[in-house]
Amino acid sequence: RAKFHFDAVYDRGLTDLGLMVWSHAGECGPYNTKTTAGSNSCICGPTEVCACYLAMATGDNNYYEIAKNLYAKQRQYLYNPDNGHVYDSYSRYPEVSYNYWASTYNQGTFLGAAVMLYNHYGDAQYLNDAKKIADFAINNFCDETGCVKVCDTNNSDLDGFKGILTRYFRRYIIDMAYNDPSYLEWMQKNCMRAYNNRNSKGILFTGWNRKTDESTNYSAFGA
């Protein structure tokens, strides 16, 4: 069923730019999916990692090719290869524009795609991208102590974003950065900060840098 649903989404959502459509209307322009104007990293990155997971699960390397091609297009339109910054969105309707907001979600999924594609193809570009993506997150999302300070709400989809970053950061450490202890130390520092800020019930939420409140009802996505 995973293959069935992925194929349906990919066939319906791939645009003439080689990017995945974010919406069939609104800021993405006309309804015609194949010539829609917009795309977001929050759609492309997850599609890439999903394709890699399907390739691993099924043995069908065509899914790696899907991930590779989509990654190349996201890299072209939604990424700065000089500093590892993953852009939020791109649009050409009614004129070319970018949203340069960086999020733990988008850095995380593009990092995951880079790691998995490197593991399969061995192309040094993915290795170099992965390091820059990881370094951008450390250098731009953290406070002076090196702990992540962004995406720490309790009322939106931001609640779970850091979990996506840490999922693929862990994979980066294990698969690529095992010879550089600074990345593991960074991960451990953030884990300890979050854990030490749990409340008396053992609940910790996505605001790792402050004590989890005793009376607030936290979303399952963010706790």
Name the predicted role of every residue range.
Residues C50-A55, Y63-A114:
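Active-site cradle of extracellular carbohydrate-active enzymes
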Residues C28-T33, D88-Y98, C142-D152:
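Acidic/His metal-coordination segments adjacent to aromatic residues that form catalytic metal sites
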Residues R1-L54, Y64-E65:
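Extended ligand-binding groove/face enriched in aromatic
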Residues R1, P46-D60, T109-G122, I164-N179:
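Well-ordered alpha-helical scaffold segments within catalytic/enzyme domains
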Residues G18, S39, K132-A223:
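CBM-like carbohydrate-recognition segments
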Residues R1-R12, G59-Y77, G122-N140, Y178-N197:
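Extended, well-ordered alpha-helical scaffold segments
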